[in-house]
Amino acid sequence: MNHLLPRLPAPPLQRCQTTGMGRLWTGAAAKVAGIVLAISVPAGGPGFAAPFPPPPPPPPPPAPSPGPSIAPIQPQRIGPAKPLLGVWFTLNDMGTLRDRSKLEEAVQQLGRLGFTTLYPVVWNGGYAYHASAVTQQRKLQDFTVRGLQGQDPLAELISLAQRQGMQVVPWFEFGFMAPPSSELAKRHPQWLTQTREGATTSMSAAGEVVWLNPFRPEVQQLLTDLALEVVTLYNVNGVQFDDHFSLPNSFGYDAYTRALYRRETGRSVPANAQDPAWLRWRADKITGFLRRLRTALKARNPNLFISLSPNYADFAYKLQLQDWRTWVKDGLVDEVVVQLYRPDLESFTAELNRPELQGKKLPMSVAVMAGQRMRPTAMPLLQGKVEALRQRGLGVAFFHYAPLWEATTDPAGRLRELGGILGER
C-alpha cells in the first residue's frame, strides 16, 4: 500500500511510498534492507541466509497436494458486530514472527489493546512465506521459512492469536505482481503480460516489477492452488487480497490477451488503454476469476471469509481494473479495508466522505499508516485518524506492526500512548 501523497493518478501498480494510494512495499525493499530468513533445503542440506534461492531445475506443473499438518477446526468470525481493529505483519516484521518469545509478547500486547484481526504476509515477491508444496513442486522455490526455534511462524501465530480471540487472515500481498528476478517470472515468461509498447515491467518505488497475466488459466490456477493450500494446511479465519489482485490499465497487450479479446468481441484491442469497453472487458475477467476463486475457497471451508484491501473505488477500477464495487454488490468479498494513507488529518477525513465508505452491505474499514521502519506516525495524528473512523462506525487496520510501537525509539512509551487511544483492556 502507499502513502504520503495526495490523490493523484499515480503509477497504479505501486503499493509504495510514492503513489499516495497504497501500502509500504515489503518485497524487494525488504530484501535490500537485509531481511534474513532461516531456510531449510528439502534435500536435507544446511540452511543459508538469503530469502531468494538460486535457480533450481525446470518445473513440472502438478496440482497441490495439501496434507493438513494442523488439526482442522471451524474458526468462528468475530465481526461484523465488533468493528475491525487489525494490523498487517509484513516481511519487515519477520524478526518478530520468527522469534517465539517476541511473537508471544506481541500477540499478548495486541490482545490487551483489543485487536481483532491479524494479516500475516504469505505471498510476496513470487515466493510463499508459509509451508508450501505448491511453490516447491513447481520449482518456484526450494526453501521453507522457519522460526529461530525451528517452528512454522504462521502456525505459531495462528495458535497464539486464536487463543486470544483474534482472527488470522493470511495476506496474499503480491497478487499478480512479481519481481522480474523471481523464479516465477524467469521460469514462466509466457505468463507475463505487457504494455502496448511491449514493456513487461513497470517501475515502482522499490524497483521493477512484472505483472502475471490474470487472464491466463495457468496464472489463475497458481493463485487458486496457493490460496487453497493455505486454507487447508492452516486453521485460518479468512484470506486477504489487496490492490495487487489487479492489473495496471496499461497492461493487457500481450499476444494471448489480444487473441482472447478478438475471439470474444470480434475486435482488435483498442490502442487507448482507457477505452471504456476495453477497461470493462479486462475488469470483468478479473471479477470472473475472483468469483471462481471464492467458490473454490468456500467449498474447502464454508466459514472462511474473503477480505479485500483496495484503493478507493474510482482509482481501483479506472487505473487497476479492480471493480470492487461490483465485488461488494455481488457478495464476492466479506470485508473491505480501504487504503487511505494521507499525511494529515484534514485530507484523511475528507476521504472518509467517499460514497463507497458509506455502504452498509458489509463491514467497511480503513487502513491507516502506522509508520515506516524507525519513522512512526506521530501519535496525535494516529489518534485523530482513529477517532475520526470510530465516530463514523468504521473499523481500522494499521500498516504495519513494527512502527506501532516495537520499532521506535521508545517502545514502552509508545505502547502506553497507543493503549490510551485504543482503550487497553
Question: Where are the regions a protein language model picked out?
Answer:
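Aromatic-lined substrate-binding rim segments of carbohydrate-active enzymes
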Residues: G126-F172, W281-L293
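Substrate-binding cleft of secreted/luminal carbohydrate-active enzymes
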Residues: D334-F348, S365-R425
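Glycine-rich, aromatic-flanked loop segments that form ligand/cofactor-binding clefts
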Residues: F115-V122, P153-S202, Q240-D243
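Glycoside hydrolase catalytic-domain groove-lining segments
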Residues: E264-P376
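Catalytic domains of carbohydrate-active enzymes, especially glycoside hydrolases
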Residues: K102-A128
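Active-site-adjacent "subsite" loops/lids of carbohydrate-active enzymes
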Residues: I78-L85, N92-L97, G175-E229, L233
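Aromatic- and acidic-residue-enriched segments that line the glycan-binding/catalytic groove
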Residues: H130-D142, F176-M203, D243-P270
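The substrate-binding groove and active-site-proximal loops of carbohydrate-active enzymes
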Residues: F89-L97, Q136-Q149, G207-Q221, D275-K285, ...
